Amino acid sequence: MISPGKSWFVILITLGELALFGLLADAGDPDNIFLRGAQRPRPILNIAHAGAASLAPQNTLASGWKAFQIGADLWGVDTRLTKDGVFVLMHDGTLDRTTDVEAIFPERAPWRVGDFTVHELKMLDAGSWFVRTDPFGQIKSGEVPEVDQHAYVGEKIPTLREALEFTREHDWRIDIEVKVVDDVSKEEIAQQLVTLIEEAGMEVWVLVSSFDHQLLREVKRLDPRIPIAALVIVAPWNPVEYLEELQADVYAPSPVGFTSGFVARLGALGFGVHLWTYNAVSQLRQFVSMEGVSGIYTDFPQRLEPILDELFDVDAH
């Protein structure tokens, strides 16, 4: 049994924790829905992975537009630096899978992104591969109209600046996953990224994510308004302590990087928890019902959206 004196102490500590959480929740711009403790437009966010990647070429403005039309809360993009230091949207370290680089620059193998200038990248077709390979089988199933297929031919690789401008024009949000390269320092990458975000006026409309947590530390140091998400494969030994030390706002684990109890605990502490990447309707339904989950990355935002609408009946925009 707790003595009266100790009970008052426990109450004071509990109230102190609640007050701290309240400060976290009220801190910053109300539009900044990714900060730890912030209010979201709905309990779980529909995060279009590389845009609506099942319906349009990944990491293009076309896939972003599709995701926006569907009603996704944000789109997630991958970004890398070009030879001349420009951030562009590209998942792979090389260009051959998702562009016609082999035909345009046959002598430049292995076609690393960092070996090309942004001008050279703008010469490439980043859309035809999607029509040719139908990576998610959605063309075969009739989900991608012929008019869209024709429009994707010749689609260009966007710069991150263009993606930010597109997002801002549509009063939307974006998750920027930063791919780190060995020949550019993390400090330099972080400084250039933060400057670009600030110039675009997107500090509270972005989430910066990365597997490189030292880069995230630097982003947070440069501008505490910018939310950061720790991408992980396997959970850290002491996840809460680690995330607090990192000043992370969001924990983004792989399928082996979380348990239901752990997710619930993080959610109760105000951290966002974004799970990746799930496409099957059965998986989407399973994880939207998991306590503590605040976002799901999916290549099929068109599948997740009706599930969230059914649960929350809130207009994402």
Model-identified regions with their sequence ranges:
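Phosphate-group recognition and catalysis centered on beta-loop-alpha active-site segments
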Residues: I2-H317
